[in-house]
């Protein structure tokens, strides 16, 4: 919804609330040119856009009793039907664009009905007395203070950091409870202060009981908490570890918002007593926290956790939120054989289209606040990206903490949306200063000088990591960044766990084994890797599978990159090879037909994309050999695909597992993926050894 300029009276009120009423000349402004945002270095992914659902992302407050079904949900159902019934790619894309356009038109109509702006109704809530806030002493041992408010110290560090070419150094490597933690700091002579113990963290009084109730299981939990509250960038792989990291970052976000609010109100009172005082305590816009999530169900669960931690009795629009984000649908009721991670991801409302503002006032929490007036923005990358493309708004210009949760799910959707949000909108200088409703005299200097990237915190939480997730936390935060890597050894890697389970099930034994063959191809750079990979597949793997394998039919080729999939498909077509292919854009009827032909052995090869596996988890019949063209992004996919051979053995007793083969293609840039599958030590051996073929039985 395009934000109209507020009238002068309301602008004056907003400035008096968040800053001084009069607009004064800003002194000592050092706007820097150049200094391109480092987010532009992110590597794009090749994933494709998912089906979207209606969202009332900036709708204003309405009566909770009025909860009629939304027409766009019917459009979404129609769109899903199209996904099942389309006959080819062109028809699918045409129908998808038509449905998306319909969603946008319906959303615009809904927004027009909900344009009763809430500035006036919130004025009473925003007028706060001295008793309503807790003043903080600006202590040098408060991470919030020294990370955002010590402007002279911050400015010196930024100058030194930029002079070094934004170089970082490894500060230390620590081991806690099965995790290696790699900590990096800017290459500067001095660093910002850092709190070393939990009892020294300055938690707002309102949140201390919630913080004290957290279950810190071990030193790893304590270390993660300290890094979050010290404003470090973090890439945390929870992998198989059960921990309530969400409560940590939500309390951190609430603590940050309360400190920001109380500091501004404290300064307002001081200015009222002495109008000559000046304070720098704001950004261009109000939103301070951005949380990106893959589905509405994850957003629903997180919002309820936030409500509980905030301990606020009045939550406006909660019933409406429940209607639009909650569903009791359990996908496991359709097919109980799906893996646990599949059921968790697609449970409930799995729509990946939403943008939602949350605003805290004196006595309440408001869901569906206007984005420009929100404190926290919850969004899916697709929903936020489409809204930003439509509105060209600046409400992300002053975000101070960005959180990517279930980031592995974001990778499986369309990582390019995340990349564009970071490079084009997040902490970017406003495009239209005339539309800003702020007191420029109180905007922090690092914000005015386009240096927000040096204090902006990025937190990423995912099952596993990838170069994309590592890159996103390597942004130039003055506090540095920390990579949390689970230690994968010979006992807990995916391949050994799979073999142990098969041995316990008496499917394999000393005489019957599955042959895992890892084959390294030469590659000098990540840019060169796709070309070298295709060449290795066509010259080495394919001839071996077609002519030398004991089973010349039933070969499943698993491809994690869609671009690689297109190249392989093109090569096989041009060489007139007999093959089948199923991908995320294959119609339901074509997919069923191809899988049936493959099961009957009519075609020797079937190409199978990772995103197809992520969204469907098919049980494929007729699989005798597997070729991993790329290593799976999710390590569990390796075991799930290999089990396709085992399933067919259980159905066909004549199938000899000793004659089945599993071939894995990799190069020296696949270390992150290799670690989870074969373990850290073996991964290092596979990448660095002189020999290029490794066989595991």
Curated annotation (Swiss-Prot):
Localization terms from the record = Nucleus, Nucleolus
What is one Gene Ontology biological process annotated in the Swiss-Prot or TrEMBL record?
A: maturation of SSU-rRNA from tricistronic rRNA transcript (SSU-rRNA, 5.8S rRNA, LSU-rRNA)
Q: Provide ranges: composition bias, Basic and acidic residues.
A: 89-104
Q: Which residue ranges have biased composition labelled Polar residues?
A: 35-50
Molecular function per GO: rRNA binding; U3 snoRNA binding
Q: Where is the stretch described as Disordered?
A: 1-128
Coiled-coil positions are: none
Q: Name one GO cellular component term.
A: nucleolus
Source species, domain of life: Eukaryota
Question: Is the keyword rRNA processing assigned to this protein?
Answer: yes
Q: Per the annotation, which location comes first and is thus the protein's main one? A: nucleus
Compositional bias of type Acidic residues: which residue ranges?
Answer: 51-68, 105-128
Keywords (A to Z) from UniProt: Nucleus, Ribonucleoprotein, Ribosome biogenesis, rRNA processing
Spell out the PANTHER family in the cross-references. Answer: ORF PROTEIN-RELATED (PTHR12933), U3 SMALL NUCLEOLAR RNA-ASSOCIATED PROTEIN 25 HOMOLOG (PTHR12933:SF0)
- Spell out the subunit comment: Component of the ribosomal small subunit (SSU) processome composed of at least 40 protein subunits and snoRNA U3.
Give the similarity note. Answer: Belongs to the UTP25 family.
Q: Tell me, what does this protein do in biology? A: DEAD-box RNA helicase-like protein required for pre-18S rRNA processing, specifically at sites A0, A1, and A2.
- The name on file for this protein is U3 small nucleolar RNA-associated protein 25
Q: Which organism is it from?
A: Komagataella phaffii (strain GS115 / ATCC 20864)
């Amino acid at each position: 919804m395009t934000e109209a300029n507020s009238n002068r009276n309301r602008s004056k009120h907003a400035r008096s609330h968040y800053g001084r009423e009069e607009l004064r000349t800003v002194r000592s402004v050092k706007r820097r040119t150049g200094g391109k945002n480092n987010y532009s270095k992110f590597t794009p992914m090749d994933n494709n856009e998912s089906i979207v659902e209606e969202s009332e992302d900036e709708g204003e407050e309405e009566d909770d009793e009025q909860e009629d079904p939304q027409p766009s949900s019917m459009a979404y159902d129609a769109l899903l039907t199209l996904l099942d019934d389309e006959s080819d790619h062109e028809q699918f894309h045409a129908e998808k664009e038509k449905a998306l356009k319909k969603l946008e038109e319906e959303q615009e109509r809904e927004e027009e009905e909900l344009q009763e702006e809430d500035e006036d109704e919130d004025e009473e809530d925003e007028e706060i007395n001295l008793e309503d806030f807790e003043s903080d002493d600006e202590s040098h041992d408060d991470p919030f203070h020294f990370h955002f408010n010590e402007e002279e110290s911050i400015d010196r560090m930024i100058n030194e950091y930029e002079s070094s070419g934004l170089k970082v150094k490894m500060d230390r490597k620590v081991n806690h409870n099965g995790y290696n933690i790699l900590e990096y700091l800017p290459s500067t002579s001095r660093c910002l202060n850092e709190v070393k113990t939990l009892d020294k963290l300055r938690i707002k009084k309102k949140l201390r009981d919630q913080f004290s109730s957290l279950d810190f299981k071990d030193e790893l939990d304590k270390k993660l908490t300290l890094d979050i509250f010290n404003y470090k960038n973090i890439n945390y792989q929870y992998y198989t570890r059960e921990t309530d990291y969400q409560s940590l970052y939500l309390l951190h976000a609430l603590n940050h918002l309360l400190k920001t609010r109380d500091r501004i109100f404290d300064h307002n009172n001081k200015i009222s007593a002495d109008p000559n005082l000046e304070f720098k305590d704001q950004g261009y816009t109000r939103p301070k926290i951005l949380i990106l999530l893959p589905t509405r169900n994850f957003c629903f669960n997180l919002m309820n956790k936030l409500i509980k931690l905030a301990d606020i009795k009045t939550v406006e629009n909660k019933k409406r939120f429940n209607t639009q984000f909650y569903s009791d649908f359990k996908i496991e009721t359709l097919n109980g054989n799906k893996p646990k991670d599949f059921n968790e991801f697609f449970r409930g409302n799995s729509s990946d289209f939403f943008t939602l503002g949350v605003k805290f006032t004196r006595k309440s929490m408001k869901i569906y606040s206007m984005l420009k007036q929100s404190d926290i923005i919850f969004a899916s990358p697709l929903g936020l990206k489409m809204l930003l493309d439509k509105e060209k708004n600046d409400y992300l210009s002053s975000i101070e903490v960005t959180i990517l949760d279930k980031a592995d799910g974001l990778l499986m959707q369309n990582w390019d949306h995340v990349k564009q949000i970071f490079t084009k909108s997040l902490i970017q200088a406003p495009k239209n200063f005339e539309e800003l409703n702020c007191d420029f005299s109180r905007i922090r200097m690092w914000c005015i000088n386009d240096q927000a990237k040096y204090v902006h915190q990025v937190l990423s939480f995912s099952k596993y990591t990838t170069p994309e997730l590592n890159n996103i936390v390597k942004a130039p935060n003055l506090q540095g960044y920390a990579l949390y890597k689970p230690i994968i050894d010979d006992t807990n890697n995916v391949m050994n766990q799979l073999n142990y389970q098969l041995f316990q099930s008496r499917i394999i034994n000393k005489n019957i084994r599955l042959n895992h063959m890892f084959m390294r191809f030469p590659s000098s750079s990540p840019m060169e890797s796709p070309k070298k990979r295709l060449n290795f597949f066509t010259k080495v793997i394919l001839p071996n599978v077609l002519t030398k394998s004991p089973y010349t039919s039933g070969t499943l080729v698993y491809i994690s990159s869609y671009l690689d999939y297109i190249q392989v498909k093109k090569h096989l077509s041009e060489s007139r090879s007999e093959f089948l292919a199923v991908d995320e854009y294959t119609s339901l009827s074509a997919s069923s037909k191809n899988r049936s032909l493959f099961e009957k052995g009519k075609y020797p090869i079937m190409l199978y994309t990772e995103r197809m596996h992520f969204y469907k988890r098919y049980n494929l019949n007729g699989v005798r050999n597997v070729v991993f063209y790329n290593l799976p992004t999710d390590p569990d996919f390796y075991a799930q695909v290999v089990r396709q051979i085992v399933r067919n053995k259980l159905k066909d007793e004549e199938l000899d597992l000793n004659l089945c083969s599993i071939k894995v293609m990799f190069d020296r840039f696949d270390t992150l993926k290799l670690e989870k599958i074969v373990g850290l030590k073996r991964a290092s051996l596979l990448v660095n050894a002189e020999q290029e073929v490794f066989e595991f039985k």
